[in-house]
A protein has these predicted regions:
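Glycine-rich, Arg-bearing micro-motifs that act as flexible, cationic patches
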Residues: 118-144, 154, 158
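A short acidic, glycine-rich active-site loop
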Residues: 58-76
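Short, solvent-exposed amphipathic alpha-helices that sit
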Residues: 25, 72-81, 106
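Small/aliphatic-rich secondary-structure junction motif
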Residues: 2-63, 90-93
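Structural beta-alpha unit
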Residues: 2-4, 82-119, 157-158
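Solvent-exposed polar/charged
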Residues: 28, 112-113, 143
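Short, hinge-like loop/turn segments at secondary-structure boundaries
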Residues: 52-56, 111-113, 137-138
Length: 158
């Protein structure tokens, strides 16, 4: 990171309280920064592949329509995140990315294409078994991204 200027930040946003909190913390740490708010969406084929029993019922022309709906919802979530970021004093644009393999790979690809210098993500407290099986986005980004990562923990309960 350059020390003369505020970095361009890729801010991962999924609509959760954790992601909203990450926007607030980012605004406090980097007032007026340029952020690219990213939501990653999953194509229907990926969902069907996980639940093979659904395949006979969801084929044909339903998949493109469902994907269009998923992409529209993703764009809407990214817009929501960008709006929150702007309200927090950041210079924000909304972006969505179609998942092709894993969420972390989509985030890394977007960080490159959008010229980000820092990735920010909220974190969730997953149980040990859940984290072992599923993993976390922040952990995967730490392992695979060449960019610095700022993982914002969830706020402590009152």
């Amino acid at each position: 990171l350059s020390t003369d200027a505020t970095p361009t930040i890729l801010l991962c946003y999924d609509g959760s309280e954790h992601a909203t909190h990450a926007i607030s913390v980012t605004a406090a740490l980097f007032p007026g920064a340029t952020v690219k708010v990213l939501h990653v969406w999953e194509p229907v084929e990926h969902i069907i592949a996980r639940y093979a029993v659904l395949a006979p019922y969801l084929g044909g022309e339903l998949i493109p329509a469902a994907d269009a709906g998923a992409e529209e919802q993703s764009d809407s979530l990214a817009d929501e995140g960008a709006k929150l970021a702007k309200q927090a004093g950041l210079i924000a644009t909304a972006h969505s990315a179609k998942l092709s393999t894993t969420v972390w790979e989509a985030v890394v690809a977007a960080s490159t294409s959008l010229g980000a210098q820092l990735i920010v993500t909220g974190t969730r407290s997953l149980s040990g078994v859940h984290e072992l099986v599923v993993g976390t986005l922040s952990h995967s980004l730490l392992q695979h991204s060449e960019l610095p990562l700022l993982a914002i923990p969830a706020p402590l309960p009152d």
